[in-house]
Regions:
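Active-site catalytic loop in hydrolytic enzyme cores
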Residues: 1-52, 65-74, 141-144
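Intrinsically disordered, low-complexity N-terminal regions enriched in serine/proline/glycine
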Residues: 8, 37, 99-102, 152
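Short, well-ordered beta-strand micro-motif
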Residues: 24-26, 108, 127-129
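Short loop segments at secondary-structure junctions
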Residues: 28-29, 111-113, 131-133
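CN hydrolase (nitrilase-like) catalytic-core segments centered on the catalytic cysteine
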Residues: 41-126
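Generic alpha-helical secondary structure signal
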Residues: 70, 74, 133-136, 151
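Structured C-terminal cap/extension of enzyme domains
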Residues: 121-123, 130-131, 137-138
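A short C-terminal boundary segment appended to hydrolase-like catalytic domains
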Residues: 136-158
Length: 158
């Protein structure tokens, strides 16, 4: 749901319902995590998928013309960098005749947090090669997951 005063009001929860589990799929090349549009905003969900062995996180999504320019690239780069995985956002093209205007800009961010593919708002397609060895390389160079201190991430009330 979104309510940015003077820009956009849209209540997805009136038509969509939330899921109740983390989705990991085994493929011929490895595990992938699958979320949907709004899920990209929750770092904990991406972390759970990465910790379950997902090497690529897929998020089909349709950010709008307010949140898209502000957050689309930033969130995909962040989730990729945080978890040292590939993060793929697949978006519909902008249709100015539709009642909802999607930002478009399908994107792939690599484990270093760099954008390796980003389309514009037009209907388009691009084929990109994803090198899963890059994940191992980045995790060796910057061992974030290895050095994570999960033991400290608990709140003890006193």
């Amino acid at each position: 749901d979104i309510d940015v005063k003077g820009k956009i009001y849209f209540k997805e929860s009136d038509t969509l319902s939330s899921g109740n589990k983390v989705t990991i799929a085994k493929t011929d090349f490895g595990k992938v995590g699958i979320g949907i549009c709004y899920d990209i905003r929750f770092p904990e969900l991406a972390k759970l998928m990465a910790e379950a062995g997902a090497q690529i996180l897929f998020y089909p999504g349709a950010f709008n013309m307010t949140t898209g320019p502000a957050h689309w690239e930033l969130t995909f780069r962040s989730r990729a960098l945080d978890n040292q995985v590939y993060c793929v956002g697949v978006a519909p093209a902008l249709n100015k005749d539709a009642s909802y205007h999607s930002y478009g800009h399908s994107i792939i961010a690599n484990p270093w947090g760099e954008v390796i593919v980003q389309l514009d708002e037009q209907e388009n397609m691009e084929i990109a090669e994803i090198d899963l060895e890059e994940i191992k390389k980045v995790r060796t160079e910057l061992p974030l997951l290895k050095n994570k201190r999960s033991d400290l991430y608990k709140i003890n009330l006193i």
